[in-house]
Amino acid sequence: MAQAKIIYDLVGGTDFSRAAPNIEGTALAVNCFTESNTEGDNKNVRTFLQSAPGVKYFDTFGQTDHCDGLYVPSTGLSAYDFEQCLFVAYNGEVFRVDSALNHEKIGIYALGNTVQFAESGGERAILMWVDGTDIHGYNLKTGETVNITLPKRIDAQNQYIQPTHIAVVDGSIVLNDKGSSFTYYSIKYPLNTAKRKVFKIVNGKVQYESDKITVSMTEVDSGVYCFLDDYGVQKYFNGSTSSDKCVAISSVGPLLTLFGPSSIEFWQKGNTESYQSWQRTSYTINKEQGLESPYSIASVNHQQFCIGTGKANAKCVLMIAGTEVRKISPLWLDRVLADNDVKSVVGWTYSKNNHSFYLFSIKNKCYVYDATTSQWHIRQSRNYYTGTVKNYMPLFAVWWNNRIITGSSESGHLYELDENYFYEDFDSENRLPLLRVRQTPVVTTNYKPFVIYELAIECNTGAMENYDRPAKALLEVSRDGGYTFGNVLESSCGRRGQYSYRLKWLNLGMNRQCVLRISYSEPTDFVMSDSEIRFKELSTPL
């Protein structure tokens, strides 16, 4: 006779299907993710589930709309000792924020569009941003506006390109053109000086000095000539093996990635011309997978992430490391992508404590990939007045003044992601404790009926700030594979200082299969490291 063995997983990621949860997966991790203590030599690996960071109010620009972009450049105003500032795109305006949280409007963008930032590099550091209609510039050291002239379309008469993405590789500024297959680029460091000397051209011919040897030069505005070489000719290229549109570009190190609806190409600088041309790297064309969501591209730790599409995997999430393109989304997430229009989805990333996260939202869920553990989890916020779940409030993230600062998906607020803060702030006054939920896969024991006498969880207890009441966790049990759940059962996590307390529930009834869902919304950390189920297998069928 086989030994009675119960199979369950209380510490893990998300693997959830609404279509057939009892067959395809019921596991959920909401506002919590898997961690392993692997530091030190000869240390046993122990996996546990820890809380996602709290959402702490930081600053505000308004109560409506949402953030359209964040950026922290490498330098700042010379008058303030080159202090790094935060740049925020909100409600059609771009603001510079200093360490004292003073706001200064420094530019505009097309209202309602997502903003992509880049920095020119070189001695004259210029912050640039594109919005799908135009390009804008700002001198980071002097605080002056820099006017930059867009290239004209190669395939149309007297029309300027409409860049949605911008990248800088080895000093060369690169733009895509919405609706076109062409990519436009500059010479190296074209904005390094306010004025630039170029060849004097009259009626298409280079002019010479009186000695008939020395080429005549003329001085021009570097912003006007940004995307022209010394002959006044535009620099551009298009896909060498694909004819689809270039809907986005991205750069990681020396590699430039071009994304089309049905292809991904990798380009790098060549040395065949005086200003270096671009050439497609060999063996790197991917014609079976393209880009579904132009603004889903985000990078962290030399890895790129995006929502792709194509005959290889249909709609899916892709991770690009170097020139390797790999699908990372599980089947349940592929179905979510397939069932929704995701063309306007925005992706963003951040990294903390050896974890690199890629995040994007669809409806009221934010799907998060942890590149360290290769697991997915979900992040959600709550409505302050009703307590019902809604989309995750943070959007975009930057590292500024030793903080992870984010924008907001529903207002002009800025937040800090703080791992030692266990609330969600809605503004400077209103907040709710962070809700964390862990739902197990289907629990079975040799696929026979069983009775659960006790569920005990090893977690941090005695962590409440006040002595007046204990922290409480809530348990719900589903006996139909995760479709519906029964009554809510409370259990104590101990009062302040009761560190030896154990979280447990007794007499959970008879089951053929069940799903356990634990919720915790106290303003303390909640870390689950292990669990135990005391049960008895039955011979009587249900």
Describe the residue ranges of each PLM region.
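Beta-sheet repeat architectures centered on beta-propellers
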Residues: 1-122, 288-303, 309-542
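Acidic surface patches and DE-rich sequence motifs
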Residues: 89, 98, 131, 139, ...
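Hydrophobic or amphipathic alpha-helical targeting/insertion segments
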Residues: 116-151
